[in-house]
Regions:
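Conserved N-terminal catalytic core of the sugar/cofactor nucleotidyltransferase
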Residues: 2-5, 13, 27-105, 109-116
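Histidine-centered beta-alpha loop that forms part of the nucleotide-sugar donor binding/catalytic region
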Residues: 8, 54, 133-134
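Short N-terminal binding/cap micro-motifs at the start of the first secondary-structure element
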Residues: 11-14, 139
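A structural signal for short hydrophobic beta-strand segments in well-ordered beta-sheet cores
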Residues: 25, 144-146, 197, 209, ...
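Residue-level signal for inorganic ion chemistry
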Residues: 34, 60, 92, 107, ...
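Catalytic-core segments of class I nucleotidyltransferases/pyrophosphorylases
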Residues: 100-102, 109, 115-122, 135-138, ...
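A short, conserved acidic/glycine-rich loop-to-beta-strand motif
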Residues: 124-134
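Phosphate-binding and adjacent anionic-ligand microenvironments
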Residues: 241, 246-324
Length: 324
């Protein structure tokens, strides 16, 4: 099966953490987000992958190569300037041809059952199927309103609290039929949520929304990045793929075998402490974060070359635990 991975982002809001790295190369507990996504695709059977690049494409090309070390066949499309999510995918028409295909963003951590999503799409004969996920802070995302059959009736882009009527947000993960891409013009910026989906609804093309189990987190802000890193340490990014090949081990060729990932033992306390620190989007995290609450201490910081995230949690009467 085929997948298009959108990996052109620069990650300006994460600049204090990533330096000049492309956004998909952000290290998540020692492993780039991009590596985790390629492993997720392989485990779900999406082994034919086209990656759209824009910002510093040579970094990702050198890192990923032809995809063989991940167990996938990898091709690239380089944009001289951003073309929007749908515009970038439209430029890959020679890749997807007449097949339904997956679209996934390179700036989120995810453990969805993507194979199950693909099967739901085919059963519904939808133009597009959207992976939905509940979010307690939905104001920065697009909300999706559905009928009882799961068909999308309306989109609410980044609402205020007065207009929040659901917690299901658009994750930017889609199964797309080629007929939907016929609505996307060539050679001009075009976005799925802002441009294509309203056209499809106006044309009475069915858009299916599927609430997903598992884990999903957009790492677009420093606050979300650190929260996601703690979730990974706590084991929340485990695969949720009942329809996929469960016997396939993780394939992360660039993971450091000398690093250990261990659960934080009192995660509820740590997360409450982090929340109370009120990390604001765009804050400077160059030197990481150090919090104290009674006898508890929590330190989160990039290592010297920003290739990993180091987390140290010290309990009042316990030996220090270090997770790399």
């Amino acid at each position: 099966m085929k997948a298009i991975l959108l990996a052109g982002g620069q990650g300006r809001r994460l600049r204090s953490i990533t330096g000049s790295l492309p956004k998909p190369m952000v290290p998540l507990v020692g492993v780039p987000v991009l590596d985790r996504l390629l492993d997720l695709l392989r485990r779900n059977g999406f082994t034919d992958v086209c990656m759209t690049l824009c910002y510093r494409p040579e970094v990702i090309q050198e890192h990923c190569g032809d995809g063989s070390s991940y167990g996938v066949h990898l091709k690239y499309r380089i944009e001289s300037e951003p073309r929007g999510t749908a515009g970038g995918v439209r430029a890959c028409s020679d890749f997807y041809g007449r097949e339904d295909f997956l679209v996934i963003s390179g700036d989120a951590a995810c453990s969805f059952d993507l194979l199950g999503l693909y099967r739901r799409h085919q059963q519904a004969d939808a133009a597009v199927t959207i992976a939905l996920y509940p979010n307690a802070e939905p104001l920065q995302y697009g909300l999706v309103l559905q009928d009882r059959q799961g068909l999308v009736q309306h989109f609410i882009e980044k609402p205020d609290w007065e207009h929040v009527v659901t917690d299901l947000v658009n994750t930017g993960i889609y199964i797309v039929s080629p007929r939907a891409m016929a609505y996307v013009p060539e050679d001009q910026p075009f976005d799925f949520a802002k441009d294509l989906f309203p056209l499809l609804l106006a044309a009475h093309e069915p858009i299916l929304g599927v609430p997903m189990d598992g884990y999903w987190c957009d790492i677009g802000t420093p606050r979300a990045y650190y929260r996601c890193s703690l979730d990974v340490l706590d084991g929340r990014l485990s695969p949720a793929q009942p329809d996929a090949s469960d016997d396939l081990p993780p394939q992360l060729p660039h993971a450091d075998p000398n690093r250990r990932t261990v659960p934080c033992r009192d995660r509820a306390h740590l997360m409450r402490t982090v929340s109370e620190a009120m990390m604001e989007a765009g804050a400077d995290f160059t030197d990481g974060l150090h919090l104290r609450d009674g006898g508890w201490e929590l330190s989160i910081r990039p290592d010297a070359n920003a290739s990993a995230l180091q987390v140290e949690a010290n309990a009042p009467d316990a030996a220090a635990e270090t997770a790399h």
